[in-house]
Amino acid sequence: MCLPSHLLSTWVLFMAAQSLGKTWLPNHCRSPIKAVCNFVCDCGDCSDETQCGFHGASTIPSTSFTCNFEQDSCGWQDISTSGYRWLRDRAGAVLHGPGPHSDHTHGTDLGWYMAVGTHSGKEPSTATLRSPVMREAAPTCELRLWYHIASRDVAELRLDLTHGVETLTLWQTSGPWGPGWQELAVNTGRIQGDFKVTFSATRNATHRGAVALDDVEFRDCGLPIPQARCPLGHHHCQNKACVEPHQLCDGEDNCGDRSDEDPLICSHHMATDFETGLGPWNQLEGWTRNHSAGSMVSPAWPHRDHSRNSAYGFFLISVAKPGTTAVLYSPEFQGSVSNNCSFTFYYYLHGSEASHFQLFLQAQGLNTPQVPVLLRSRHGELGTAWVRDRVDIQSAHPFRILLAGETGPGGVVGLDDLIMSSHCMLVPAMSTLQSSLSGPVPLALYPQTSIKLPQQTCEPGHLSCGDLCVPPEQLCDFQKHCAEGEDEHKCGTTDFESASAGGWEDISVGKLQWQWVEAQEKSKPAGDANRDAPGHFLSLQKAWGQLRSEARALTPALGPSGPHCELHMAYYFQSHPQGFLALVVVENGFRELLWQAPGGGSGSWTEEKIILGARRRPFQLEFVSLVDLDGPGQQGAGVDNVTLRDCNPMVTTESDQELSCNFERDSCSWHTGHLTDAHWHRIKSHGSQLDHTTGQGFFMFLDPTDPPARGQGALLLTRPQVPVVPKECLSFWYRLYGPQIGTLCLAMRREREEDILLWSRSGTHGNRWHQAWVTLHHQPEASTKYQLLFEGLRNGYHGTMALDDIAVRPGPCWAPKSCSFEDSDCGFSPGGWGLWTHQSNASGLASWGPWIDHTTGTAQGHYMVVDTSPNVLPKGHVAALTSEEHQPLSQPACLTFWYHMSVPNPGTLRVHVEESTRRQELSISAHGRSAWRLGSVNVQAEQAWKVVFEAVAAGVEYSYMALDDISLQDGPCPQPGSCDFETGLCGWSHLPWPSLGGYSWDWSSGATPSRYPQPSVDHTLGTEAGHFAFFETSVLGPGGQAAWLRSEPLPATTVSCLRFWYYMGFPEHFYKGELRVLLSSARGQLAVWYQGGHLRDQWLQVQIELSNSEEFQIVFEATLGGQPALGPIAIDDVQYLAGQQCKQPSPSQGEVAAPVSVPVAVGGALLFFMFLVLMGLGGWHWLQKQHCPGQRSTDAAASGFANILFNADHVTLPESITSNPQSPPDLA
């Protein structure tokens, strides 16, 4: 075997490394093995940090090392021992599967992630994903990732870290699981030497076990690199690294060689790590010293201590009962005004929002201890990390430090590594002061203010105001229950002139925090939002935490809120591109991004309005920011003048009852829902997005790829409405446009009832507005309120949805112009024997019916079916299905429908049009070989009319008839297989195939603005007003994805002519879309014509003669043969001339292809012959390679089917060669 010269050296190195028993990595600069995968780029191209569970892409310090699984698995390996295993997978592989339909990186189905699929085994099993060996994690190292779990699919998730002989559990949970992608952030702590990370999912017999993992990020994990000189004031470590002065003697190995914690440097510090006891500290009650090895008392307990980062390390934990306080107190220290005494400590708050940690300073008065002064207060859920903090103390009197912890239900408060700096001088043991302070007085004896509070008469958690006791659920509910509104005082609305800050509380755990500050003239911003220099605002400030985490400020629990609820505020923001300022809502433990400051900010105060809408209680608002305060320029962030307006849910306006809306003034009664991070937006017409009302006005718009949307869909719903009449007609205009757009649904919601699906459409409906209408059936009780909701589902990611001109009128609607039976029976009523049934094969009542519907091609799709077996419908008897009334027609129309008749002859399907009289338009008796067939009827009706389908039974056992996808289109019915696309796609179907990516051909005209490139004129009319079918190939990803446009089933033919015009436009030759013509039958698919195109701004004609001995469909396949680029493929004026040979047309506009004769018989012999030909070509190519040429000829034609068999548009097929491209099974 010969190897190319450029691969030979790589192969030799690999074999040499294997022979020496060493790990071989693509390390271009040959770093020592200890410097590989250590979160530091030693090579100029960072190649020493690839396949490490992440990819090193930048040599910039503090850059995160990430893996988004788009190119490979980054070295992560499945080490599962059962069939329940991890693999790298792509989003949307299964349309209705349990996994995510989009990845987290891109939010589309083109993205990749690691996934463990469903497992049908009855035994419990665990799928384990393990990282490669990593080395030397810094104390600041943070691992972040996103995971996705279908509801109740997994029993447990856990994240472990193994180093040496110990395995640390970094995170573990058994739910509850939230919707969509959820973020996990854990701190690894300082890890010396080698370590691995494992992510595992455990399922049992009651769980399917579908889990996905994406966007793994290692943040700030690298140790500082050696430097010849350190910045002024920094400490130079023994290994030549530099650390900041406050990192000395702080209980963490910041240098990487522990020289910053050298006992010689830290000998004057008083450090207590609880490994051998409490040291000089004492407790009144409630604290106990413990470790995490073995079984833990509570799931919220720390899995490791801070000092040793080990489960065997000791810490203090609060064991006080909920409602009581555990108190730890220090020895007495001497007072000093000249020197700061610094106290560094690490605390742990996890498991309960009600847990509380406080730090008090208690100074000694002349004779007795003074009232303790609160210096730090933290409460709530701060995660599983040990949080560092520090206080600097200046006291003229001797003092003690008191640490108080109060645990909420299921919560834990922990302490570790209490460090007093060298300037904290102990009071001599036998001093007079020491003897006078026999011990601290319990905290409960000291009120925190000098005002004597009245005796509390309300229960804990209740607010006392006058004679009222306001319960917790009525606090911050946007309704005043107290006379002075005290129950709404600390609920987010504030100008920050009061120290209470309107209830906003900092919950940061890292190097940044939110603080209530006074504006200074010499700093930025120079004043608050009111331009007052002494004014106050909420400002982003430095903190003593060790992690590079976002700063967070949170309100108390709020709600419920009404649909008009808005937050008005002023903000200041200036940052480099990586910084941000955002507003988040926290609801049921999950976070939704509401707003983010644009770009790098303006550096001045800016007013902003954010719609919050109707939300259930409890929810909280949170300001989140990450800014490099040490970076160049005056970077920073601030918030002021926060006002929550119109949030009372009881407040109504006239517009709340306005269902009819053209969205020109506002959104009337319609408002956005908040179940996911995808949202409808009211926008003004611009570019290719034009409203329906005027073409220049407003409408509701949804872009499924609008960042940062990752949720399943977006809701647009009304306020609760009171019915006016028993039946109302709701009409609206909608647009579903794009090569891979999702589903738009309309539903009705009543209290304590399941939502009622009224209408739905999926996939592209062309680049235009369509009108739809639905009859609303109200309950007899007039007091029963209802809501209407439109939901745009993100099961497609290329295209847009839009709504406009919603109108409601009394009385029922006309019959719909199209019906897929997916949401309802569309008003069709069974007559006669009443045997027609609305069902799907998966959940049907009829004994017999099609395996799949026509709309979705799945067993879950719906249709109408009648069982014509003699025991149900005797021979000669009729089962009728009658539509509602259609409005009169101003011009002839074509009624199309798809029917399915069993192979045992079920009888006859008759179609009648009932105007003033009933007239039969069509009669079908052929069974159609158990496949969906297209039927069509020309309709002319000057009055209101109905369509009636009649099933006449033949008395045959196990027989049935079914109907699906009934549609009424303007203009006469076209011939089978033919279409000029002026009124639509005729009988051609663009149903997306999930196995091909779920893409669809679209329908448009040159005059209609489009976000995708398209021909400027059609071929039929040669003008911008003409229409055509087209597909934009740039949305396709790699891996054989394609879009199909399929004809209706066509009968067997000895000779027929297919004639069509096509258009292809690509900027360069290597940007190549491909157009194929396939013939599909029960035996597979056969490619009969192919063209790969580049820029040709003209329409070209092709003729193909076809013959086939069995029924078939014509398929136009658009796919990608090169690099993705904007470029359309379009077709127009398709003619199928049954029983006719192709004739050479006279030259006309554009080029003309020569006719091609293609006898089609997709038999086993031909497929086998094709296999032999391909094997022969492959063998010839292999033999050629054995000569090992040094370089190919630069002017040789590229090998491939295109240049061999096709020349421009003149097609020459070898007489007996066929191809069988991989594709879904029989399309019939």
UniProtKB/Swiss-Prot annotation:
Record-linked Pfam families: Ldl_recept_a, MAM
Q: Does the keyword Signal apply?
A: yes
Q: Which UniProt keywords apply?
A: Disulfide bond, Glycoprotein, Membrane, Protein transport, Repeat, Signal, Transmembrane, Transmembrane helix, Transport
Q: How does it sit in the membrane?
A: Single-pass type I membrane protein
Q: Where is the signal peptide?
A: 1-21
Q: Where is the MAM domain?
A: 65-223, 270-426, 492-649, 659-815, 817-975, 977-1144
Where are its TM segments located? 1160-1180
Q: List the disulfide bonds.
A: C230-C242, C237-C255, C249-C266, C458-C469, C465-C482, C476-C491
Function, in words: Probably involved in the sorting and selective transport of receptors and ligands across polarized epithelia.
Q: What is this protein called?
A: Apical endosomal glycoprotein
